[in-house]
Regions:
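Catalytic core of PPM/PP2C metal-dependent serine/threonine phosphatase domains
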Residues: 73, 149-190
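Glycine-rich phosphate-binding loop plus the immediately following alpha-helix
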Residues: 113, 120-145
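Conserved beta-strand-loop-short alpha-helix elements that form
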Residues: 2, 103-113
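Glycine-rich phosphate/ribose-binding loops and adjacent secondary-structure elements
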Residues: 111, 179, 245
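Extreme N-terminus nucleophile/cap motif
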Residues: 1-59, 204, 245-247, 253-258
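A conserved acidic, glycine/proline-rich C-terminal tail/linker
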Residues: 203-246
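Gly/Ser/Thr-rich active-site loops/lids in small-molecule metabolic enzymes
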Residues: 125-130, 190-213
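Short acidic (Asp/Glu) patches
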Residues: 52-64, 78-100, 117-121
Length: 258
């Protein structure tokens, strides 16, 4: 399967430390060698970097590990292919426009017997993965349910998306990250965890490579940063492990739903 990584923060923050740990799982400490991608939000815009090769050997990944792109929301994914060939078009995260915002999505897991359920017309997949088709179906269902205008209150939208994720989970393993550039949603079938860092900040040590960071030297007392991952990335912090069917919604680093 694949691995997920995401971040929600109340100030523009770089994800160099966490991505350095994740990238090692793309061929060094893990078997996820079939591509990787990462999306950084900046206001209503975003920038996405992808590569169909292993993150541990990718020069583009080296850039992400060395150049601190600051963002309040980041979504990332390293791939171990099961549905769809190894190619750039099948590499997560996937992005679509809805209600004048870019929605970004990544999925870890594998689905079966899904083609009859995922009927879409407006949102079409470009590649041939179960993941991208599920994303298109979620957005199509949201538009059919809520209409063409973005609701003033987004809580019912994410509540509804959680019910859709429950349906998808009946078809297999569905761990999901989803963001509209404001909120970050995480849905768990079997492997997902998160940690929220706030003052007083301390040191953290990566599991997958010999890197230590002192967050007190990198942050201010007002910073709040939540990181979501398939498995804990550090060995000296208390990560919160989600249970099957759990979902969380974060805004500016804080838990707002779930």
């Amino acid at each position: 399967m694949c691995e997920l990584l995401a971040m929600s923060a109340n100030v523009p923050t770089d994800i160099v430390f966490s991505f350095t740990g994740l990238a090692e799982r793309g061929g060094v400490t893990g078997p996820h060698v079939d591509g990787w991608g990462i999306t950084f939000y900046e206001g209503k815009g975003n920038r996405t970097f992808k590569d169909a090769s292993a993150s541990s050997k990718s020069h583009i990944a080296d850039l992400i590990k060395s150049y601190p792109i600051k963002s309040e929301i980041v979504v990332s994914h390293i791939r171990q292919a099961n549905r769809g060939c190894v190619s750039l078009v099948n590499t997560h995260p996937f992005t679509r426009e809805l209600w004048g915002r870019y929605w970004t999505y990544a999925h870890n897991g594998q689905l079966s017997e899904y083609h009859d359920k995922f009927t879409v017309s407006r949102f079409q997949p470009v590649g041939d993965t179960d993941s991208e088709l599920a994303f298109c179906w979620i957005l199509e269902s949201v538009v059919n349910h809520f209409g063409e205008q973005e609701p003033e209150n987004m809580q019912p939208v994410f509540d509804y998306i959680a019910t859709l994720a429950d349906e998808i989970r009946e078809l297999g393993v569905f761990n999901m990250l989803l963001s509209n550039g404001i909120d970050l949603m995480a849905y768990c079938t079997n492997n997902l965890c998160h940690i929220t860092r706030r003052a007083p900040f301390g040191k953290a040590t990566l599991i997958d490579t010999d890197v230590v960071i002192d967050f007190s030297q990198e942050t201010t007392p007002n910073d709040v940063v939540t990181v979501i991952a398939t498995r804990p990335l550090t060995n000296n912090e208390n990560w919160v492990v989600l249970s099957p069917g759990d979902w969380k919604l974060f805004r500016k680093g804080e838990l707002v739903l779930g």
